[in-house]
Amino acid sequence: MARSKQHKKPRIADQVDPHELYQESVQGVEFELDFVADTFRAIRGRAPSTIREDFCGTALSACEWVQRDRGNRAVGVDIDPDVLAWGYEHNVAPLTPSQKQRIELLPEDVLEVDAGRFDVVQAFNFSYWFFQERATMKRYFERVHDALVDDGIAFFDAFGGYEAHRCQKEKSELDGFTYIWEQAAYNPLSAEMICFIHFRFPDGSRLDRAFSYNWRLWGAKELRELLAEAGFARTRLYVQAFDDDTDEPIDRFDETEEIPDYASFIAYIVAEK
C-alpha cells in the first residue's frame, strides 16, 4: 500500500506581510497625530490642517490625518515607489472619495521635493537619521523650513540614553507574533549604527531582517543646533514620561530641558518656524 503524502503546514513567516507587521508593531499614528495637533494648537492658538509626512513609507499617518477632518490635507513623501504602491493599495484605496482627493503620495527625495507649504512637516520613526553627515542634515532641515507656512511647525522624534550606544536586542510580545528590535552594530567614533527589525511567530518560524537601517545616532542637542542654523526660531523638547511605580514608559510626553540619566528614552523635537 502506498503511503499517503504528508503535506508540510505552511510557515507563518512565509504568509505574513512585513508592512502590516510594521504598522502594527512600530507605528502609533493616532497618538502621534494627537500630539502633533494638540502641541500645534497650544503653541499657535489654532488647529493645523495641512501635513507633509516625510519618509512616509506606507503613508499610514497621512491617511489617518485626512480621515480626522474634512478640511485636512496630507502629502506623503518617500523615495521608495514600491512601499508607496503598497501604501496606496492598502491604506489609500479604502478611503472615501473625498478623503482620496485630499491626500497625495509623492515618490520623491525629501531633499528635493517641492509640494507647497504646510502647517506641519513631520518625520517620525527616526527615519531622517538616514542622513549621517552634518551638512546633509542641515540641508534637510532647511528644506523643511522652506516647506512650512509662516507659523508652521516641524515635528521629529529621537531616542537616546546609555543603552542606545550598545548592541542589544529588545523583544515585545504582540498579538500573534514577537517583535524584535536589534541594534546590531555601533561605532562610537562615528555614531553610526546598524539596526534590524525581526519577527518571530508561534510556530517557531521567523522573519529575520524584515527591515534594516543604517543610521547615525544623533544627539538631541546637536539636532536642535542644526535646526537653529537652518532658520528655525525655536525648538522644544518633549520627553516620554515613565510610570512612577513600574518605571515603564507611558503615553505622555512632557516638555523639559533636563532628564535623569535614563537607560533609554524617546523624545519629540518640535521646531517652530
Model-derived features: where do they sit?
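Conserved SAM-binding strand-loop segment of SAM-dependent methyltransferases
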Residues: L95-V110
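A short glycine-rich, Lys/Arg-flanked "PGG" loop and its adjoining helix->strand segment in the class I
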Residues: M137-D150
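Conserved class I S-adenosyl-L-methionine
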Residues: A47-G57
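Conserved SAM-binding loop
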Residues: G87-Y88
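Conserved SAM-binding loop of SAM-dependent methyltransferases across substrates and taxa
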Residues: T58-G71
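SAM-dependent methyltransferase
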Residues: F155-L226
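A short acidic, Gly/Pro-enriched loop at the edge of an enzyme's catalytic core
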Residues: L111-V121
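C-terminal lobe and adjacent flexible extensions of AdoMet/dcAdoMet transferase-like proteins
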Residues: L217-K273
